[in-house]
């Protein structure tokens, strides 16, 4: 009934309390993910590039026209929460998105982008990769630097292992392709499952 009058995902503060991590675990509340983050919003498909941080979208019915990402201030989940934990099967890192007033769509995109572009791969992480993948990461990193994606690109020809960015690890899978629940994977990876843990899918 409310949906016909006001979109329940509209930006704003009129959503009741924001659940902290403790509230969420005590209540064991199931979270409803914003349809745009699930990739199930009919009118808008999010295009989010993890290398550049650019966000936009398109309507599946009219793919030739770009649509601005106007939903960035909408809540990422209902009920709203202070923290989302995001992992992906394509990298070893865990991204924690935090906002005391409730995590928004913009928080999700900006935090993921910063986590992957402002943090470097450690030498130990790099050395865990098979030689073939190390070579691919090195090539991707050089391409990203040539494109001027990283500040200081001109100072490094071939970056040292600790200069590779986390986004380089993803190789060609640099486009956000939705979040989903996968409790079995979360438990295997983190040792526990929780309502606010989501798996990020990526595409090339």
What positions do the PLM features span?
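Extended amphipathic alpha-helical regions
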Residues: 71-204
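Ser/Thr/Pro-rich, charge-biased intrinsically disordered regulatory regions
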Residues: 1-93, 111
């Amino acid at each position: 009934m409310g949906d016909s009058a006001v979109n329940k995902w509209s930006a704003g503060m009129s959503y009741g309390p924001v659940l902290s991590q403790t509230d969420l675990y005590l209540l064991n509340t199931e979270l409803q993910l914003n349809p745009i983050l699930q990739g199930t919003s009919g009118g808008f498909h999010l295009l989010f590039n993890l290398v550049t941080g650019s966000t936009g979208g398109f309507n599946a019915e009219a793919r030739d026209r770009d649509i601005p990402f106007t939903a960035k201030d909408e809540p990422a989940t209902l009920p709203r929460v202070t923290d989302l934990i995001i992992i992906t099967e394509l990298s070893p890192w865990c991204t924690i998105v935090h906002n005391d007033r409730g995590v928004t769509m913009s928080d999700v995109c900006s935090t993921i982008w910063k986590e992957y572009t402002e943090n470097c791969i450690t030498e130990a992480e790099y050395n865990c990769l098979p030689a073939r993948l190390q070579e691919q990461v090195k090539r991707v990193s050089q391409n990203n630097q040539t494109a001027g994606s990283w500040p200081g690109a001109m100072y490094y020809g071939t970056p040292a292992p600790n200069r590779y960015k986390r986004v380089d690890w993803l190789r060609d899978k640099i486009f956000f392709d939705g979040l989903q629940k996968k409790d079995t994977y979360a438990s295997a990876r983190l040792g526990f499952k929780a309502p606010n843990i989501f798996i990020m899918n990526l595409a090339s």
